[in-house]
């Protein structure tokens, strides 16, 4: 299982939110590129980026910070937040992102996901953010009646590289991941599923790994708070 350290970008800074609330942002640094380089130096295989302003605005907002990160690191990076059309997808992939994450648009325009996955094989992921099993969009501000598992299954034949499943109520709360829901989603589809939201300790990571169904896990606040030791986590996952 791959550990994806998270860099959430708000106003050019590295922050973490509590359950997706922009007003509940904790600033962890003003040099996201240096943070990405530190994750790479520690041995991370990937870096997970989120343009928080972009998720709410529906267009890229923290482009300068993302480009600075891409210029600093050699490991692959994936980005979500505000990516809602083919032009933006193509632009980011040309700029050096390994993978784009489509969230809101996966609900509102699933045909775009299929088109992008065909055009850029292996480089398009779907972000499914859910509260009590129901998908939320537009930076989690809008709740839908779409069930997370149904949305995941609808992309089974689309060629998407991964599904990033976030349990909103666990995100940034240090409350532990929703292992049962994530495992159930991962077993419902053949697409690799990456868990996000609530990873707060090494035990959480190992519990996700031990399901045998989950391909990766994203962690942010726990790494910044020191609750999860990155070196120890990487060693444990490779053991």
Curated annotation (Swiss-Prot):
Molecular function GO labels: 1-(5-phosphoribosyl)-5-[(5-phosphoribosylamino)methylideneamino]imidazole-4-carboxamide isomerase activity
Reactions performed catalytically: 1-(5-phospho-beta-D-ribosyl)-5-[(5-phospho-beta-D-ribosylamino)methylideneamino]imidazole-4-carboxamide = 5-[(5-phospho-1-deoxy-D-ribulos-1-ylimino)methylamino]-1-(5-phospho-beta-D-ribosyl)imidazole-4-carboxamide
Pathway: Amino-acid biosynthesis; L-histidine biosynthesis; L-histidine from 5-phospho-alpha-D-ribose 1-diphosphate: step 4/9
Gene3D superfamilies per the UniProt record, alphabetical: Aldolase class I
Active site: 8, 129
Signal sequence, renumbered to the chain: none
Key words of the record: Amino-acid biosynthesis, Cytoplasm, Histidine biosynthesis, Isomerase
InterPro entries in UniProt: Aldolase_TIM, His_biosynth, HisA_bact_arch, Isoase_HisA-like, Isoase_HisA-like_bact, RibuloseP-bd_barrel
Main location: cytoplasm
E.C. code: 5.3.1.16
Biological process according to GO: L-histidine biosynthetic process; L-tryptophan biosynthetic process
Cited SUPFAM superfamilies: Ribulose-phoshate binding barrel
GO CC aspect terms: cytoplasm
PANTHER family: 1-(5-PHOSPHORIBOSYL)-5-[(5-PHOSPHORIBOSYLAMINO)METHYLIDENEAMINO] IMIDAZOLE-4-CARBOXAMIDE ISOMERASE
Family to which this protein belongs: Belongs to the HisA/HisF family.
Protein name: 1-(5-phosphoribosyl)-5-[(5-phosphoribosylamino)methylideneamino] imidazole-4-carboxamide isomerase
Organism of derivation: Cereibacter sphaeroides (strain ATCC 17023 / DSM 158 / JCM 6121 / CCUG 31486 / LMG 2827 / NBRC 12203 / NCIMB 8253 / ATH 2.4.1.)
């Amino acid at each position: 299982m791959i550990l994806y350290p998270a860099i959430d970008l708000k106003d050019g800074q590295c922050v973490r939110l509590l359950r997706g609330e922009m007003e509940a942002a904790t600033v962890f640094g003003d040099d996201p590129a240096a943070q990405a380089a530190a994750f790479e130096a520690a041995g991370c295989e990937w870096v997970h980026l989120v343009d928080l302003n972009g998720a709410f605005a529906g267009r890229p907002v923290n482009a300068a910070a993302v480009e600075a990160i891409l210029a600093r690191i050699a490991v692959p990076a994936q980005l979500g937040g505000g990516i809602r059309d083919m032009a933006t997808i193509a632009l980011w992939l040309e700029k050096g992102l390994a993978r784009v994450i489509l969230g809101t648009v996966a609900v509102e325009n699933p045909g775009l996901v299929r088109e992008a996955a065909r055009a850029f094989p292996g480089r398009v992921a779907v972000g499914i953010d859910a509260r009590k099993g129901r998908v939320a969009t537009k930076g989690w501000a809008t709740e839908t009646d779409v069930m997370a598992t149904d949305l995941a299954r609808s992309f089974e034949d689309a060629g998407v590289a991964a599904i990033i499943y976030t349990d909103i109520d666990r995100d940034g709360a240090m409350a532990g991941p929703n292992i049962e829901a994530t495992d159930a989603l991962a077993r419902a589809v053949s697409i690799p599923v990456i868990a996000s939201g609530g990873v707060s300790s090494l035990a959480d990571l190992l519990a996700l790994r031990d399901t045998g169904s989950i391909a990766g896990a994203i962690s942010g606040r726990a790494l910044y708070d020191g609750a999860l030791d990155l070196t120890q986590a990487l060693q444990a996952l490779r053991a």
